[in-house]
């Protein structure tokens, strides 16, 4: 259902902190023109933690409007309160989105059975497909393979974004689920390896900056041309690491500002704009990768 390169899109903001919707449209157009296979609205990279519900929902609505059915839009709907996750999902269900991305509840460290109850409740509350999102580096709680397998039996839970970077875990999960269950990498550094091990796509931060290369890499891997996929991945490998020198999405925003795609690299507190050394480093990497001339 959801395969290829899905970009974990940033949420552009003016220096005042308000959402910059003209730049958001420019970004959506940029991804359509450069072959991205889908957009993730207001996930981790979209600063979901600092967008109140009304803004969160409005950004999703605008992205759907700008995408104009030319590219799928999946909305981040995760929360560490099951009631809030359900509320968000219900509010966004009628916006025209193609599905939800729902993260493992963070901070309160639910048990595995608690995760099962949480995600089943979220999926029961919608008619749209749900992607699970496991990112223990941010949430602390880790959704284990047997838990994924149990949740995969729910008819609305169609896949998993796995940001562990652990290819062995992917291989462990594959025989536990139906063949139609989708595995998407949430770790750019290991995304190509994930695809060659049988993954179906990526939800990528790097794709903010090089959408064409990421979509071409995915297309090559999914067609079985692993040598071409690895060749493309090597061309952008420096970007994979450079974009994460500071917490995401600090440097992706600065890179897009440098590319002229957004008007400001502003982030909402507690995130702040990148250090000069980081900016100089990623600018050089962008030149090395052909992003900047």
From Swiss-Prot:
Query: By its UniProt entry, which InterPro entries does this protein fall under?
Result: Aldolase_TIM (IPR013785), DapA (IPR005263), DapA-like (IPR002220), Schiff_base-form_aldolases_AS (IPR020625), Schiff_base-form_aldolases_CS (IPR020624)
GN (gene name): dapA
Where does the record place the catalytic residues? 133 (proton donor/acceptor), 161 (schiff-base intermediate with substrate)
Q: Where in the cell does this protein reside?
A: Cytoplasm
| UniProt keyword annotation of Amino-acid biosynthesis present | yes
- Any keyword Cytoplasm? yes
Member of which family? Belongs to the DapA family.
What protein name applies here?
4-hydroxy-tetrahydrodipicolinate synthase
Q: Give the organism, scientific name.
A: Pseudoalteromonas atlantica (strain T6c / ATCC BAA-1087)
Q: Single GO molecular-function term? A: 4-hydroxy-tetrahydrodipicolinate synthase activity
Q: What is its EC number?
A: 4.3.3.7
């Amino acid at each position: 259902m959801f395969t290829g390169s899905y970009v974990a899109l940033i949420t552009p903001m003016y220096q005042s902190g308000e959402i910059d919707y003209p730049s958001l449209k420019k970004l959506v157009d940029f991804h359509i023109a450069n072959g991205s296979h889908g957009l993730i609205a207001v996930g981790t990279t979209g600063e979901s933690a600092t967008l109140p519900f009304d803004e969160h929902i409005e950004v999703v609505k605008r992205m759907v409007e700008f995408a104009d059915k030319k590219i799928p839009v999946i909305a981040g709907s995760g929360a560490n309160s099951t009631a809030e996750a359900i509320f968000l999902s219900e509010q966004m269900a009628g916006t025209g989105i193609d599905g939800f991305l729902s993260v493992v509840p963070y901070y309160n460290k639910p048990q595995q059975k608690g995760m099962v109850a949480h995600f089943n409740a979220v999926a029961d509350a919608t008619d749209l497909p749900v992607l699970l999102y496991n990112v223990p580096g941010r949430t602390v709680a880790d959704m284990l393979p047997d838990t994924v397998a149990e949740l995969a039996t729910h008819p609305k839970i169609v896949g998993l974004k796995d940001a562990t970077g652990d290819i062995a875990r992917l291989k462990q999960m594959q025989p536990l689920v139906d063949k139609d269950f989708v595995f998407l990498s949430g770790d750019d550094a290991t995304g190509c390896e994930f695809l060659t091990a049988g993954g179906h796509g990526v939800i990528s931060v790097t794709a903010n900056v090089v959408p064409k290369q990421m979509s071409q890499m995915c297309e090559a891997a999914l067609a079985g041309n692993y040598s071409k996929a690895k060749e493309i991945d090597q061309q952008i490998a420096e970007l994979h690491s450079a974009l994460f020198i500071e917490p995401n999405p600090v440097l992706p925003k600065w890179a897009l500002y440098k590319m002229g795609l957004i008007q400001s690299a502003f982030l909402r507190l507690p995130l702040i704009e990148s250090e000069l050394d980081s900016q100089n480093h990623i600018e050089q990497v962008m030149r090395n990768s052909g992003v900047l001339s």
